[in-house]
Amino acid sequence: MRIGVLTGGGDCPGLNAVIRAVVRTCHARYGSSVVGFQNGFRGLLENRRVQLHNDDRNDRLLAKGGTMLGTARVHPDKLRAGLPQIMQTLDDNGIDVLIPIGGEGTLTAASWLSEENVPVVGVPKTIDNDIDCTDVTFGHDTALTVATEAIDRLHSTAESHERVMLVEVMGRHAGWIALNAGLASGAHMTLIPEQPFDIEEVCRLVKGRFQRGDSHFICVVAEGAKPAPGTIMLREGGLDEFGHERFTGVAAQLAVEVEKRINKDVRVTVLGHIQRGGTPTAYDRVLATRFGVNAADAAHAGEYGQMVTLRGQDIGRVPLADAVRKLKLVPQSRYDDAAAFFG
């Protein structure tokens, strides 16, 4: 059997660990070969590929961030129009099963390819942790660790200068990074997309903390956080070429509004892409490896149109169509637990 693998969408710590596990499992357990398509689905459209080998180069991938295959986003319309070329590329390279590793967009494309009778097994990745039907995605733990360490450091400088610090983190429309980093770092408030915020409530908590004699205030702000209707208006960035919302720096805009209302120095730190880069944590390496092994097993078992998942401690599989039906967002109960520590 000949397996194809690609990484699509944004990069993420742990991608190389999945590739390594797929290659090792296919070679050692099944005697199959693996072809990597470069720069995601673009590699399928342009027939750009590389033979992957079970050797020292493959072993060294485990701790390496990013993706050795490269990654890119391809517009869904271009992908649909390119279906004949995709089928030709798979046929020319003798690919029996394709294993796409990616987030919402990549897995949606994989689900569509499955409907077009392409044998596909999906592997979920995203630092945002917003893929449904799996408890967690690899990459999230690394991003969470980076964010938490950064906020830990900001506590000391904010305390020294009696400042309000707004820390903007990634996550798009899901608040998992912000929520978990806020809890782990002892932040005094967390704003997430699932819970529109009231600027007056933010300022009330800030004032209350300083009135009690506390020396600083840390607020974690998810990049997709939005004000409640009828409160303040923030600048909107419109949509990009893929129909995704452009985020316009909510923390910086919020800082201006907070400074208007309280007599305190407000500073903003945007963590940005540092959350996506670098060496994956041990947890992400293990999870990514388990996902890769299970995806290779599913490919050889003929379980196509599936996505590998983590449920509890067990790796399983669910239909791709179920996994991409909706995003996994922060439930009210989880936010309520975090809110007990606000102020």
UniProtKB/Swiss-Prot annotation:
Q: Which GO terms describe its biological process?
A: canonical glycolysis; fructose 1,6-bisphosphate metabolic process; fructose 6-phosphate metabolic process
Out of the domains of life, which is the source?
Bacteria
Question: Can you tell me which residues bind ATP?
Answer: 10, 73-74, 103-106
Q: Under which name does UniProt file this protein?
A: ATP-dependent 6-phosphofructokinase
This protein's GO cellular component annotations are: 6-phosphofructokinase complex; peptidoglycan-based cell wall; plasma membrane
Q: What is the lineage of its organism?
A: Bacteria, Bacillati, Actinomycetota, Actinomycetes, Mycobacteriales
Any idea which positions bind Mg(2+)? 104
Q: How is the cofactor bound?
A: Magnesium may play a role in formation and maintaining of proper enzyme conformation and multimerization.
Tell me the pathway: Carbohydrate degradation; glycolysis; D-glyceraldehyde 3-phosphate and glycerone phosphate from D-glucose: step 3/4
Instruction: Name the residues annotated as site: Important for substrate specificity.
Output: 105
Q: How does it assemble?
A: Homodimer or homotetramer.
Per its record, the protein catalyses:
beta-D-fructose 6-phosphate + ATP = beta-D-fructose 1,6-bisphosphate + ADP + H(+); D-tagatofuranose 6-phosphate + ATP = D-tagatofuranose 1,6-bisphosphate + ADP + H(+)
